Amino acid sequence: MIPNGYLMFEDENFIESSVAKLNALRKSGQFCDVRLQVCGHEMLAHRAVLACCSPYLFEIFNSDSDPHGVSHVKLDDLNPEAVEVLLNYAYTAQLKADKELVKDVYSAAKKLKMDRVKQVCGDYLLSRMDVTSCISYRNFASCMGDSRLLNKVDAYIQEHLLQISEEEEFLKLPRLKLEVMLEDNVCLPSNGKLYTKVINWVQRSIWENGDSLEELMEEVQTLYYSADHKLLDGNPLDGQAEVFGSDDDHIQFVQKKPPRENGHKQISGSSTGCLSSPNASMQSPKHEWKIVASEKTSNNTYLCLAVLDSTFCVIFLHGRNSPQSSPTSTPKLSKSLSFEMQPDELLEKPMSPMQYARSGLGTAEMNGKLIAAGGYNREECLRTVECYDPHTDHWSFLAPMRTPRARFQMAVLMGQLYVVGGSNGHSDDLSCGEMYDPNIDDWTPVPELRTNRCNAGVCALNGKLYIVGGSDPYGQKGLKNCDVFDPVTKSWTSCAPLNIRRHQSAVCELGGYLYIIGGAESWNCLNTVERYNPENNTWTLIAPMNVARRGAGVAVLDGKLFVGGGFDGSHAISCVEMYDPTRNEWKMMGNMTSPRSNAGITTVGNTIYAVGGFDGNEFLNTVEVYNPQSNEWSPYTKIFQF
């Protein structure tokens, strides 16, 4: 009921409109009163807005000696892209970050005390965690000191320990190998009590005997478990045993050797570091000891993941009969759980090729696998779809597409694969599209394009599917027009056109922007690059590539774009260049081992794969991978032999 004599009006659009205008003022630098200096990058903003979102910045602004001047805040330990994501969030309440950037956004949110953002990022990481990545996620959570995230990761590890034990990350962990001699008719206790005794033994070995953890891991340690449930150090026949734990798990210790003077060594490898977030500054708690997960894998054989003196490592424990027993009575462990298995025991072999040679194919990553669909070779335009598992180096077939299709690109949206446009071998201007659902292994049609097009770029961005550029029905002229598909309304709408007509371009998403790279205007190869901002629906020309090319592939790794292969107007090429968005610069990188035009280039896990294409003479079914540490490409893979 409206009180008599009062006018009451509520503008439903006011908040949204004001927020948008505030963000526009920030981007144009108007009325800004704070400069954030992040690793050499300067960002302007408004103190009042940031103070409302970040208690950390509020404290800085509140203690500023000149509240009316321009504040300068240095944040040298953060990723500039991550800080920009948080600035956009502060002004729009929308958090948009490329999956490769989420850990850095988390680190920045922790620094700025933006707890809600930190929690959202943590939940996102948990949603993407699987047996191949959970160890690196645990290292990250430990470095961040996030007990909530750490507990959830540990719960996942406890549930999937045996599966995790076959993964590469597990096999690279430091390992403590124990062989426990048992008196006749004596069995080892339950996991919990057993590893409590083991941890007590490790602590005493380090603190009292002067051993380092690294030295304990250099060789198999022999212990003795007696009939009265005591864990003895050394061979009891020598009369030099130490006692570690009895029925009530109280330690009874007799020093056997004097403490050493040398300090403890740091365990090498990936035991405690923040593997995927170089900007993280938090460290694991000092002198942390914890059993994360354990499993009895066979009779008297135990596997455990533990934190020993803040080092995340594996404990292998094997019980066998008394010292007089023959070594041949030891049960054989599987290779992945054996004492002998070391991270460098890998078989290097040529990567398995696809079943079909393919050029002009679509590639994408889905559920940790590489998907290669369609394309053409000397015989036909293909509708077959192959799936590559990096862990087994094996290709398998998925359900074929409904339509033979080449000269198209593929994207993953909401867990499903989308292919649109392209050529079927007879018509170079398809308007049809289809969607693959991995749950039912089948393809279904999607609404037709507004414009028939071939050689167009396709990319998922902010929950929608974009198709940009491409060639006209005659295949001689590039297009400027771009369309966007909403999977909720199942409809196509137009968005801003490109600045330059182009087809056979490489397209991808990074940091909430869409990039279209190279291509050709007619048949003249381009080195120009455009970036699309969905917030203001505009395309902007950015730094050009060093090499003009069409038919190249692009992938994202560590927040950077890698563009490889293509055709330079006269030859298929193998050169690769990298774009750093923080510097707006391109840099030449190591060449692929083979020239590849119209190949598929995709990131799976933390590895860039190049598949198929045309080398100037042959259609290819081969695969190669990029090693960022050595800046080299290789057609070989290393797999563990079990």
From Swiss-Prot:
Task: Give the UniProt entry's GO cellular component terms.
Answer: cytoskeleton; cytosol; nucleus
Q: What induces it?
A: Decreased expression in various organs and cultured cell lines by doxorubicin treatment which may reduce mRNA stability.
What keywords tag this UniProt record?
Cytoplasm, Cytoskeleton, Kelch repeat, mRNA processing, mRNA splicing, Nucleus, Phosphoprotein, Repeat
Task: Tell me where in this chain the BACK domain is found.
Answer: 134-233
CDD domains registered for this protein in UniProt: BACK_NS1BP_IVNS1ABP, BTB_POZ_NS1BP
**GO terms, biological process:** intrinsic apoptotic signaling pathway; mRNA processing; negative regulation of intrinsic apoptotic signaling pathway; negative regulation of protein ubiquitination; response to virus; RNA splicing
Query: What Pfam families does its record include?
Result: BACK, BTB, Kelch_1, Kelch_KLHDC2_KLHL20_DRC7
Query: Polar residues compositional bias: what residue ranges?
Result: 265-281
Q: Where are the Kelch repeats?
A: 369-415, 416-463, 465-512, 513-559, 561-606, 608-642
Q: Looking at the record, which segments are called Disordered?
A: 257-281
Q: Which InterPro entries match?
A: BACK, BTB-kelch_protein, BTB/POZ_dom, Kelch-typ_b-propeller, Kelch_1, SKP1/BTB/POZ_sf
Q: Which cysteines are joined by disulfide bonds?
A: none
What tissue expression does the UniProt record report for this protein?
A: Ubiquitous expression. In the heart, the highest expression is detected in the ventricles and the lowest in the atria. Expressed in dendrites and spines in neurons.
Q: Keyword Nucleus, does the record have it? A: yes
Per UniProt, residues of the BTB domain are 32-99
Annotated positions of the Phosphoserine modification:
S246, S277, S322, S336, S338
Q: What does this protein do?
A: Involved in many cell functions, including pre-mRNA splicing, the aryl hydrocarbon receptor (AHR) pathway, F-actin organization and protein ubiquitination. Plays a role in the dynamic organization of the actin skeleton as a stabilizer of actin filaments by association with F-actin through Kelch repeats. Protects cells from cell death induced by actin destabilization. Functions as a modifier of the AHR/Aryl hydrocarbon receptor pathway increasing the concentration of AHR available to activate transcription.
According to the UniProt entry, the note on domains is:
When the BTB domain is lacking, AHR signaling induction promoted by IVNS1ABP is massively increased; Thus, the BTB domain inhibits AHR signaling induced by IVNS1ABP. Dimerization is necessary for proper splicing activity of IVNS1ABP and this is mediated by the BTB domain. The BACK domain is necessary for proper viral M mRNA export.
**Homology family:** Belongs to the BTB-kelch protein family.
Q: How does it assemble?
A: Homodimer; through the BTB domain. Interacts with AHR/Aryl hydrocarbon receptor. Interacts (via BACK domain) with pre-mRNA-binding protein HNRNPK; the interaction is direct. Interacts (via BACK domain) with splicing factor PTBP1; the interaction is direct. Interacts (via Kelch repeats) with RNA polymerase POLR2A (via C-terminal domain). Interacts (via BACK domain) with splicing factor SNRPA; the interaction is indirect. Interacts (via Kelch repeats) with splicing factor SART1. Interacts (via BACK domain) with ALYREF; the interaction is indirect and likely plays a role in mRNA nuclear export.
Miscellaneous notes: Transgenic mice overexpressing Ivns1abp develop normally with no gross abnormalities up to 7-month old. However, they display a marked resistance to the cardiotoxic effect of doxorubicin which is an anti-neoplastic agent known to affect actin skeleton and an effective drug for cancer therapy with cardiotoxicity as side effect. Overexpression of Ivns1abp in the heart protect cardiomyocytes from apoptosis and improved survival rate after doxorubicin injection. Disorganized actin skeleton is observed in cells transfected with isoform 2 (Nd1-S), which lacks the six kelch repeats.
Q: What is this protein called?
A: Influenza virus NS1A-binding protein homolog
Q: Which gene encodes it?
A: Ivns1abp
